[in-house]
Amino acid sequence: MERSPFLLACILLPLVRGHSLFTCEPITVPRCMKMTYNMTFFPNLMGHYDQGIAAVEMGHFLHLANLECSPNIEMFLCQAFIPTCTEQIHVVLPCRKLCEKIVSDCKKLMDTFGIRWPEELECNRLPHCDDTVPVTSHPHTELSGPQKKSDQVPRDIGFWCPKHLRTSGDQGYRFLGIEQCAPPCPNMYFKSDELDFAKSFIGIVSIFCLCATLFTFLTFLIDVRRFRYPERPIIYYSVCYSIVSLMYFVGFLLGNSTACNKADEKLELGDTVVLGSKNKACSVVFMFLYFFTMAGTVWWVILTITWFLAAGRKWSCEAIEQKAVWFHAVAWGAPGFLTVMLLAMNKVEGDNISGVCFVGLYDLDASRYFVLLPLCLCVFVGLSLLLAGIISLNHVRQVIQHDGRNQEKLKKFMIRIGVFSGLYLVPLVTLLGCYVYELVNRITWEMTWFSDHCHQYRIPCPYQANPKARPELALFMIKYLMTLIVGISAVFWVGSKKTCTEWAGFFKRNRKRDPISESRRVLQESCEFFLKHNSKVKHKKKHGAPGPHRLKVISKSMGTSTGATTNHGTSAMAIADHDYLGQETSTEVHTSPEASVKEGRADRANTPSAKDRDCGESAGPSSKLSGNRNGRESRAGGLKERSNGSEGAPSEGRVSPKSSVPETGLIDCSTSQAASSPEPTSLKGSTSLPVHSASRARKEQGAGSHSDA
């Protein structure tokens, strides 16, 4: 039984946070200085770490001591709050028998004043012992010396978590090395007005970054084929940073509701920062923010890889595109693996400045291995490949130095790559510098905060603290600015005259289409196609291409309405010389034997009637000029003979596969109609393609036949 106080003292030893040795200290509490002992030891039974806090807590029981409800009440309180410490390193605790007597004598007064007996002083927790208290040798002569020494060299017992920062339950919280302790919220370094300014700044920058990255992505959607490999990773890179900027904007809107825990008045807990993955909202924000931050960095590395393959290894776009599956596997797989690992390790931390959740804000090891190390690795690999690619491009530029045009293009491309890489690397390297600076000085900042608030929170103050070692708000603002501005560099790559043209065309296409303008455009495209195709045929014939030439025309419907009334004669102005086109058409007809036979049939079948039929049906009202009966009969006969020879002229501009007569007569027909009649013609008539390959003699013969009729 005699060893029970010593065993209890051994149990209390782990409570000593900053003790390196078990030492006694002189009593400084005035009420207990008249006791038979003058040395004490902390922490005591209630977990008090110094005599000042113990004296304050003991003051709640002074009413009992002043009323002297029990003759031994004052001695018991001093032994409980200021325990005895002997030179033999023996902590003496109050006895159970004395405790039971005090409670029995003072129970009525405690009920009257509403005093609650502390759980730490329950009598059944105290040891059975005698009431004799050992006294240190020379109690009054040795008191002044150690007391002065204590004033000169204060005892550093480490950090004690304030009561309002303690967390309930097993949530895995850890702050300044203390379990179940969380940082305060709002931020422990800055004032409220500084935090408001920082939040507004982050919100504005996130909006700019979000708009820039969305513009890059939407430009890609307008013309997907424009951004092929090796440039395609820029699009995925911009998508990643659009999500990052969106998360910061969400944090700006929500404030600290996601990054901080609300105060609990019942448990006497204040606002604390979220630590761990138990908070679902904070975990979701962390997943998106960390995953896409790392994915964006990896996509930049892949961009440098594709540039190196194209410039240094001379890979084609198709060869690089075949490796796209591996690019996606690395870019999305590695960040996903790190994100899942951090969630499993319970490393999620709330950021009470920006309102988001990230990693490494209070855990220095997590910041070192999950933020700094991946970013430094990506910068090293990407910068190495980028320099290798630029060196290869410079070598190519020296090889083609006599080709002024290509050399100028290559020079502009190199400048473009250099500026884009600089816009990415400079902010990223600055961000790494902020992380390193914060990692080195965070412990000092925390000790300064500890020293500034120890008296306010009634916790022991640190032995040494530099009052000037406080963080600057500008450092954190630069860190958030560099985090977001990295995504804006993608706008530089897509920002060109071609992008403006694509956006202008996109808005123009979305307007309501005019049927007249649309049908004119269709006709103009058809004429341009015929002219281009005939030029190719002439080129082949000039070089002695064997066999007859045939023009196979495929008419394509543009979805326009044939009921609209318009005049398409002016659309033929796109072709400058239709006489040349007619000459080429005549040449093509005579090169084919089958076409010669068909031409003879057409002569016998009254060719002018066929021509009048073609142009007349397409012209609409102008067909009344050939309204006699004989003209109709000859027209019908010509139609019959043409149908027997598989040369029926379709009304919509199509030519039979067996016909070697090209459909180029539309130009002459439409032009002549536009000149002769100002009345608008139907769309059906304007899109028909009559034959314009008859000779001058045939025209004269047709004119004579028409006059006879």
UniProtKB/Swiss-Prot annotation:
Places the protein is found: Membrane; Cell membrane; Cell surface; Apical cell membrane
Skewed-composition ranges (Basic and acidic residues): 596-616, 630-644, 697-709
Pfam families documented for this protein: Frizzled (PF01534), Fz (PF01392)
Membrane topology type: Multi-pass membrane protein
Residues spanned by motif Lys-Thr-X-X-X-Trp motif, mediates interaction with the PDZ domain of Dvl family members: 498-503
Signal sequence range: 1-18
Broad class of where this protein is predominantly found: membrane
Lipid metabolism found in the keyword field: no
Residue intervals passing through the bilayer: 202-222, 234-254, 285-305, 325-345, 371-391, 417-437, 474-494
One GO term describing the cellular component: cytoplasmic vesicle membrane
Spans within the Extracellular topological domain: 19-201, 255-284, 346-370, 438-473
Family the entry assigns: Belongs to the G-protein coupled receptor Fz/Smo family.
Entry GO MF terms: G protein-coupled receptor activity; ubiquitin protein ligase binding; Wnt receptor activity; Wnt-protein binding
Chain ranges on the Cytoplasmic side, renumbered to this chain: 223-233, 306-324, 392-416, 495-709
Keyword RNA-binding in annotation: no
Highest taxon of the lineage: Eukaryota
Free-text comment about domains: Lys-Thr-X-X-X-Trp motif interacts with the PDZ domain of Dvl (Disheveled) family members and is involved in the activation of the Wnt/beta-catenin signaling pathway.
Protein name: Frizzled-6
Organism: Mus musculus (Mouse)
Residues of this chain annotated as glycosylated in UniProt: 38, 256, 352
GO biological process: cell proliferation in midbrain; embryonic nail plate morphogenesis; establishment of body hair planar orientation; establishment of planar polarity; hair follicle development; inner ear morphogenesis; midbrain development; negative regulation of canonical Wnt signaling pathway
Biased composition (Polar residues): 583-594, 620-629, 669-690
